[in-house]
Regions:
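Short amphipathic alpha-helical patches
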Residues: 72, 101-105, 133
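FAD-binding core/adjacent interface of flavoenzyme oxidoreductases
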Residues: 2-92, 167-168
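A Rossmann-like FAD-binding core segment of flavoenzymes
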Residues: 7-34, 43, 110-168
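Glycine-rich nucleotide phosphate-binding loop and flanking beta-alpha elements
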Residues: 56, 100-102, 126, 151-152
C-alpha cells in the first residue's frame, strides 16, 4: 500500500522522474547530462534528487544448473508482485539469502499465506540483524539453513523443486 501511495503521489506531482537513467555529469550551474532510454539529454534543475538504486543478484548470476523455469524471483520482483499487483508469488517459497531483506521477505511471504520452506544462507550464520532473525524467522518458525546453497533448479516451464547442497 505504501508503494501504491508513492506512485500515485509522484504521478500528480510537478516533478520530473527519470527511471533507468544514468547521470553522466553535474555542474554547479544546476545542469546535468543524462543518458537514459531516450538517449542523451541535457537538463537544468532547481533541485535534484539522485536515487541511485541498486542491482539485485539474479539466480542467473549464481552457479546453479538446470532450466530457468518460471517461479524464480528476485526480492524486488517479489515485492512488486505483492505490493503493487497484490499477487502471491507462489504457495511454497524458499528464500535464498539471510540478510535483512531476505528475513523480512520470508516473514512477508508467511503473512501473504505462503508456506516458507526455509531461508538458505551460504555463510555459517544469519546475515541479518538479530532482531530481524527473531521477529521474522523464529516467531514464524521458519528454518534457517546455514552453510547451504541451491545447486540446481528443477522444472520444465514452472519451478517444481531445487537441489540444496551443504557446504561443509
Amino acid at each position: 500500500e505504501y508503494a501504491a501511495r508513492i506512485v500515485a503521489q509522484m504521478e500528480g506531482a510537478a516533478v520530473s522522474v527519470r527511471l533507468n537513467t544514468t547521470v553522466l555529469s553535474l555542474s554547479q550551474r544546476r545542469t546535468a547530462e543524462l543518458s537514459g532510454p531516450g538517449g542523451y539529454e541535457p537538463v537544468a534543475f532547481r533541485r535534484l534528487i539522485l536515487a541511485t538504486g541498486c542491482r539485485e543478484k539474479t539466480i542467473g548470476s549464481l552457479p546453479v544448473t538446470g532450466t530457468r523455469p518460471a517461479g524464480v524471483f528476485t526480492a524486488g520482483e517479489a515485492q512488486r508482485m505483492i505490493n503493487l499487483r497484490h499477487w502471491r508469488p507462489g504457495r511454497k517459497v524458499l528464500v535464498l539469502g539471510s540478510g535483512d531483506l531476505g528475513l523480512i521477505m520470508a516473514r512477508r511471504f508467511v503473512l501473504e499465506g505462503c508456506q516458507v520452506l526455509g531461508v538458505v544462507e551460504q555463510k555459517g550464520s544469519c546475515g541479518g540483524m538479530v532482531r530481524n532473525y527473531r521477529s521474522c524467522l523464529l516467531e514464524h518458525r521458519i528454518p534457517l539453513m546455514t552453510r547451504t546453497t541451491v545447486t540446481r533448479l528443477h522444472g520444465e516451464g514452472r519451478l517444481t523443486g531445487v537441489t540444496l547442497r551443504h557446504l561443509d
